[in-house]
From Swiss-Prot:
Membrane topology: Multi-pass membrane protein
Subcellular locations according to the entry: Plastid, Chloroplast thylakoid membrane
Quaternary structure and interacting proteins, as annotated: The 4 large subunits of the cytochrome b6-f complex are cytochrome b6, subunit IV (17 kDa polypeptide, PetD), cytochrome f and the Rieske protein, while the 4 small subunits are PetG, PetL, PetM and PetN. The complex functions as a dimer.
Protein name (Swiss-Prot/TrEMBL): Cytochrome b6
Pfam families: Cytochrome_B
Domain of life of the native organism: Eukaryota
Length: 215
């Protein structure tokens, strides 16, 4: 086993990377509230794992979506547990994200030189909210249907471009198969990809600049 480790160590300098990670200075004022971002990340990883598991059974069509969710909850092995964990971690992710944003704002973590860290964090917060909106529609139940109908109907109040925006969001004049397809694609591919990209921008900046000082 040591020979395998030595082979990788010679080429990748694994020990140096590990030392850099474990020896990072943590300011004495840091408390549990500074862990909210990490908890949000953990919830996101749980979401990815459980969401991926459900894609094996979920069918994104208006005629089969609700039945496929019922199948996950009643027939698929541990489906009820996977979907429940997905829902619970989704709620936890939103809550932790909100608390994290408030903590950063109240402790002045958005100030120079961390402006870009703040901007990427705000984008991640918007993406988190978008996960909630798109995911809510996927079971194709009454609550999800009317929630999506109301949310996608909000831009209609905008003069001139309101109606085209609504049709762009829904895929048609009304909430239907095109809407479900759009939201499923956003929820399972576009939003996770964008979230991963902005996380890869967000975390290195935190690593480089360190944790902000106390007020």
């Amino acid at each position: 086993m040591s020979k395998v480790y030595d082979w990788f160590e010679e080429r990748l300098e694994i020990q140096a990377i590990a030392d850099d990670i474990t020896s990072k200075y943590v300011p004495p004022h840091v408390n549990i509230f500074y862990c909210l971002g990490g908890i949000t990340l953990t919830c996101f990883l749980v979401q990815v794992a459980t969401g991926f598991a459900m894609t094996f059974y979920y069918r994104p069509t208006v005629t089969e979506a609700f039945a496929s969710v019922q199948y996950i909850m009643t027939e698929a092995n541990f489906g009820w547990l996977i979907r429940s964990v997905h829902r619970w971690s989704a709620s936890m992710m939103v809550l932790m994200m909100i608390l994290h944003v408030f903590r950063v704002y109240l402790t002045g973590g958005f100030k120079k030189p961390r402006e870009l860290t703040w901007v990427t964090g705000v984008v991640l917060a918007v993406l988190t909210a978008s996960f909630g909106v798109t995911g809510y529609s996927l079971p194709r139940d009454q609550i999800g249907y009317w929630a999506v109908k109301i949310v996608t109907g909000v831009p209609e109040a905008i003069p001139v471009i309101g109606s085209p925006l609504v049709e762009l969001l829904r895929g048609s004049a009304s909430v239907g198969q095109s809407t479900l397809t759009r939201f499923y694609s956003l929820h399972t591919f576009v939003l996770p990809l964008l979230t991963a990209v902005f996380m890869l921008m967000h975390f290195p900046m935190i690593r480089k600049q360190g944790i902000s000082g106390p007020l």
